[in-house]
Amino acid sequence: MKTIVVTDIHGCLEELESVWAQAGFDPETDKLICLGDLMDRGPYSFGVFDRFRSLKRKMGERCIMILGNHDDMMMNSFYDPVVYARWMRNQGQTTLDSFEEHHCDLEKQLRWFYEMCPYYENEDAIFVHAGLVH
């Protein structure tokens, strides 16, 4: 079993799939740790979300999802107009467009993002998107 760690996918599904192919990622046996920032910038935020959601269902505890700052900003933008404006400046519209293109209401999918961890720790390492708050 390999452990595959990815981060800052930012809606770039094709590049993510390419990295997984190069690494020989096997969702049947490997462990996957995503260090966050699934959304924004790239054109396929919905595809990235859908792929990880499917993998989490299939892999269970072998798929660790850590919250990134863009994921957090996206989640909070639905409740705070200041955060929404910041999200739009950080290419949040590309995420909204991607979800709308698939007739999927992003706000209704927020529960899945709330299940992400702030960090993951095993006997060898601590995995985090950018830093730990003390």
Language model regions located:
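N-terminal active-site segment of His-dependent metallophosphoesterases
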Residues: 1-51
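A sequence-composition feature that detects small, non-aromatic residues
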Residues: 21-23, 85, 125, 130
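Histidine-centered divalent metal-coordination motifs
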Residues: 8-10, 69-70, 129
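Active-site neighborhood of divalent metal-dependent phosphoester bond hydrolases
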Residues: 41-123, 133-134
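Beta-strand-turn-beta hairpins that frame and shape the catalytic cleft
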Residues: 1-4, 120-126
